[in-house]
Amino acid sequence: MNFLNYFYHSKKILLQKIDGQFMKVSLNWLKALGNIKTIDIDNKYSTNTAGFEVEAIESIIIGGEIDHILDISSTANRSDVLSMIGLSREVSALTGSSMFQLYINPIIDIFSKKETIISNHDLLNCDNYFAAIIDEIRVKDSPDWLKNRLLSSGFTHRNLLTDISNYIMLKWGQPINIIDLNKINNMNHKNSLTIRSNFPLGSNDQIKLNNENIELNKNILVTQVNTNVTSIAGIGSNSDFDTDYNTKSILVESAIFKQSVVRKSSRVLNIRTESSIRQERGLNVDNWKNAHFEALALITDLTCGNIRDTFCREKITDHALNINLSIKKVHDILGPIMYNGQTRFLFFEEIQNILHSLNFDLIYQNKENIEVTVPNYRREDVFREIDVIEEIARIYGYHKFRSSVPNIQFNKRLSTKRKFIDKSRSILRNLGLTELVHYSLIKSKGNIALNNPLIQDYSNLRGSLLEGLIESNLYNIKQSNQTIDSFEIGTVFHNDQNKIVETTNLAIILGGNLDIRSTWSHPAHSLNWYEAKGIVENFFQRLNRQIEWTKKDILDGRIKFIQKGKFATLIYNNIIIGIFSELNQATYSELGLNTKLFFLEVNLNILEDCHNEFNYLSYQIQPYSKYPSIIRDLSLIIPKNMEIKYLLKLLDQFYDKDLESTTLFDQYIDESIGKEKKSIGLRFTYRSNEKTLTNSEIDYKQHQLQKKIVKQLNLKIRQ
């Protein structure tokens, strides 16, 4: 795919329609940087298996020489290879070549200027910032070598200063802004400059990117020179201050902004640029310095300009990242290789050479262990022992290791956990619920972040199953469909004392549709609390689990879905296993629903605990009574905060051998009953195993029961 057709030829803040994962790479430039004599361009296998993919190869003639242009893609975690320097490091490691000296010596005395023209007012979300004022420049035509480098990378010449900034970004991966100071309001040779990065306070702020007006808001980080908004931080510079052939005085900026802030601005504005792609993935401090020094050297050399003042703000990097590497673990994970028809493991010297080629410093080593220091530009993706082992395999070549399936004796019997999950799934399907399956990766922040996400938008492990079920119902509603009574059984992740714990959860979502009828003659209604709770209780009953429903608060991420005052915490064997609740109003508004939705999420690991499962039921078998039952209803006025479960437990003390069951059938709350009071309806079912009970016998029993309720429980009977 020739993605460079999307480039706007004149600027380095090129607006693109791609994710920025592809680069056009000049083979001649790559060989020059890496001191590489030959590369087999027809054999893409080694590059593809080394973490990069060559999408296409094109041969062109530039400056009278044949050059091969490679379309290369890399993974999201390899921000260090979004530059020719980074790629040349990789190719040098793969081919065993040595890199040329990359360090750029700063121009003599550029930091010893006596003038203090540039002042730092407030650099928000920016820890590393270079700036320099260069005067008396003459913008001439770009030299041929510079034009050729840009042309081979898909850029077209515009003017010398823009070409230099594009060249530096391609070579070092560090965006450079060059601002025409003659276009800054109220700016002359003697004025001082105040630089800042901040969020705009005005409501009508605008900026021109690529000559298009962009509306700003308080969530967009911008940079300013004096009172002029010169760029959207990390994304692109203001077209009003672009350089041209009449430019005489410039401000050269290079900065590293906070990745999350640039990513947020890019999403809000729906703009992806060469600069934002690199800022989002993370920039390297060493490259930042070298890029700025080389930019100043090129500008002063090619424009004959004079550096008037400089400013630098640098965050001191943390201590070196050291990783202990076990040779035995390398052999255990990677396995043996085939060498000259024989099977053997990697030699210690081979591992050493690979680490040296990757610029990993070896600070301690013996035949069993190596302690390595990871270079700064690889600290984003290499910070564990397994990462170092992966690098060894990648450079040596995955295809050189023997591929064999281990001989494992599988136990054909299903585990207790698998049986329990299958049973739960079967019960829920029998109850009429639809099973859904979602990814374990989510967009939400605040969860457990992946170290190596393939897609930045899905870089967190889920801590709950509810978000997936809610999003599925939201999608159905947007497609003019109904909500689905559904469930999901899957793994969730959470931190427990700095350890990542994985559990198997069950989540259910119920309601939302006007399809519940008591009989065909009654109008349809939406699911209410008691009906939803009844479905959940039915599920637990079929699992043979006695669940306690309480009002204990829950403080995890699910609290954002809870409707205040309409939730219950579920307890099994004195352990909180989950929550049942009505969805809150905010979620209703998001879904566009007028009817109620209820959800359940429980930890199946606790429910499945085989130690708590009865192997033999403790029931006593007795024949059903052949005599009819008689029902009596009773209305009581009780405190509003009294739980029905507690009341039924109190009534159990009034034992009557003919009382078969006591159930709640009604609840009524009104000011006429009394403040902090509610009326409930209880249904008492009487049945004898010995005879048919008469009405007079039942009336007497019921009268005695009412007297005990009034006297002993101090409750009022509603007439």
Curated annotation (Swiss-Prot):
Superkingdom to which the source organism belongs: Eukaryota
Cofactor: Mg(2+)
Hydrolase as UniProt keyword: no
Alphabetical GO biological process terms: phenylalanyl-tRNA aminoacylation
Binding site for Mg(2+): D381, D387, E390, E391
Catalytic activity: tRNA(Phe) + L-phenylalanine + ATP = L-phenylalanyl-tRNA(Phe) + AMP + diphosphate + H(+)
Occurrences of domain B5 (ranges): 318-403
InterPro entries found in the cross-reference section: aa-tRNA-synth_II/BPL/LPL (IPR045864), B3/B4_tRNA-bd (IPR005146), DNA-bd_dom_put_sf (IPR009061), Fdx_antiC-bd (IPR005121), Fdx_antiC-bd_sf (IPR036690), Phe-tRNA-ligase_IIc_bsu (IPR045060), Phe-tRNA-ligase_IIc_bsu_bact (IPR004532), Phe-tRNA_synthase-like_B3/B4 (IPR020825)
GO CC aspect terms: chloroplast; phenylalanine-tRNA ligase complex
This protein's name: Phenylalanine--tRNA ligase beta subunit, chloroplastic
Cofactor info, note text: Binds 2 magnesium ions per tetramer.
Enzyme nomenclature, EC number: 6.1.1.20
Record family assignment: Belongs to the phenylalanyl-tRNA synthetase beta subunit family. Type 1 subfamily.
Subcellular location as annotated: Plastid, Chloroplast
SMART domains in the record: B3_4 (SM00873), B5 (SM00874), FDX-ACB (SM00896)
Pfam families: B3_4, B5, FDX-ACB, tRNA_synthFbeta
Molecular function as annotated in GO: ATP binding; magnesium ion binding; phenylalanine-tRNA ligase activity; RNA binding
